[in-house]
From Swiss-Prot:
Residues 1-26 form the signal peptide. It comes from the Bacteria. It catalyses: a triacylglycerol + H2O = a diacylglycerol + a fatty acid + H(+). GO terms for cellular component: extracellular region. It is found in: Secreted. The lineage of its organism: Bacteria, Pseudomonadati, Pseudomonadota. It comes from Pseudomonas sp. (strain 109). This is Triacylglycerol lipase. Substrate binds at M42, H109.
Length: 311
């Protein structure tokens, strides 16, 4: 009788093990070989009053095994200055984590920022991923650049934007930092982007809207972006992004601030997510399109892609 009674128990244990096995696999779904480092865009931050710039993304990646670090650089400055600041933090993360390399992911102006690091220190990173980044410039930046340089209008606007950057920096890090909105504008317009690309061409497509080299100097390049400025009527940022999308010429597909073709770098995962520029980092507060995959899921899938590539 005792032997018979063990059979159902054994079956139960076996079934429980089978049921549990997907959970065990899921726990390492985002466990990349090297840590993931996130780099914010213009007027970005790491955390303000408990709210992450990368809303819900770091915790979702960590939950299934990823080692994630969130960086903060100048809210407003040139790609090179921001890149040098990020490089210093990457070197610190490498020392802290004990890993020789990190996977960099940059949103918006964070895209050119991580490209700078990849170009000058490719030994520190196996991959560079850009999300909604204006690698060939932004029509919105070109529109703003029409304000005459040195004019009173430029001085007033740059002063206001610098003040906003200083406030964001203070709320996030306790210091106003150095803000250079004109430096950001020069980096993000078409002419400035072309100059940057001439110095750091790695991963940039040679055609108007194609893909770039998938791998350069040991660094794998990836990108994705959205193409829908208006996605959720409850999201207060949609009104601003809907207005800014009007600066794009000839019906150019865009996310409200960046054209889809300009966002291409290396392997293009996708450039037509139903997301706007802030949806790409799951903002504002996760109010994204109900008819598109969650931005958090996109980051999780990419972490798994990096894992499967042994990165």
């Amino acid at each position: 009788m005792k032997k018979k009674s063990l059979l159902p128990l054994g079956l139960a244990i076996g079934l429980a093990s089978l049921a549990a096995s997907p959970l065990i696999q899921a726990s390492t779904y985002t466990q990349t070989k090297y840590p993931i480092v996130l780099a914010h865009g213009m007027l970005g931050f790491d955390n303000i009053l408990g709210v992450d710039y990368w809303f819900g993304i770091p915790s979702a990646l960590r939950r299934d095994g990823a080692q994630v670090y969130v960086t903060e650089v100048s809210q407003l400055d040139t790609s090179e200055v921001r890149g040098e600041q990020l490089l210093q933090q990457v070197e610190e993360i490498v020392a802290l984590s004990g890993q020789p390399k990190v996977n960099l992911i940059g949103h918006s102006h964070g895209g050119p920022t991580i490209r700078y690091v990849a170009a000058v220190r490719p030994d520190l990173m196996p991959s560079a991923t850009s999300v909604g980044a204006p690698h060939k410039g932004s029509d919105t930046a070109d529109f703003l650049r029409q304000i005459p340089p040195g004019s009173a209008g430029e001085a007033v606007l740059s002063g206001l934007v610098n003040s906003l950057g200083a406030l964001i920096s203070f709320l996030s890090s306790g210091s106003a930092g150095t803000q250079n909105s004109l430096g950001s504008l020069e980096s993000l317009n078409s002419e400035g982007a072309a100059r940057f690309n001439a110095k750091y061409p790695q991963g940039i497509p040679t055609s108007a809207c194609g893909e770039g080299a998938y791998k350069v100097n040991g660094v794998s390049y990836y990108s994705w972006s959205g193409s829908s400025p208006l996605t959720n009527f409850l999201d207060p940022s949609d009104a601003f992004l809907g207005a800014s999308s009007l600066t794009f010429k000839n019906g150019t597909a865009n996310d409200g601030l960046v054209g889809t073709c300009s966002s291409h770098l290396g392997m293009v995962i996708r450039d037509n997510y139903r997301m706007n520029h802030l949806d790409e980092v799951n903002q504002v507060f996760g109010l994204t399109s109900l008819f598109e995959t969650s931005p958090v899921s996109v980051y999780r899938q990419h972490a798994n892609r990096l894992k499967n590539a042994s990165l």
